[in-house]
Curated annotation (Swiss-Prot):
Processing after translation: Phosphorylated by MAP kinases.
Family matches, as PANTHER family: PROFILIN, PROFILIN-5
Disulphide connectivity of cysteines: 13-118
Official protein name in the record: Profilin-2
Amino acid sequence: MSWQTYVDDHLMCDIEGHEGHRLTAAAIVGHDGSVWAQSATFPQFKPEEMNGIMTDFNEPGHLAPTGLHLGGTKYMVIQGEAGAVTRGKKGTGGITIKKTGQALVFGIYEEPVTPGQCNMVVGRLGDYLLEQGL
């Protein structure tokens, strides 16, 4: 299965029990910042933004003072799981990033999708990749 299939079928899918509700953008990005696969709507990010995100996983709290930036959009960092999950909020939407052994799984959402639904979608694929040694 291609990485694009994982994004299309497992991240950009309808939210379970909520037909028509889905993430607004998603991607799988290697720890080195290389894009493995992304939705057409995923923002073009700068290398320094990805470096900041990786630093936050290695040094939890790194992004809290400045915010999480992706594609020029600033998200307020909210509670995640140190070294495993980073979450951000902006207006009625937000972002969830799950770190696996080799990649970062990104999910970006807007209402009516909830933070919990985004966390579930991103976490499920992230956990699967971890189980596969990825």
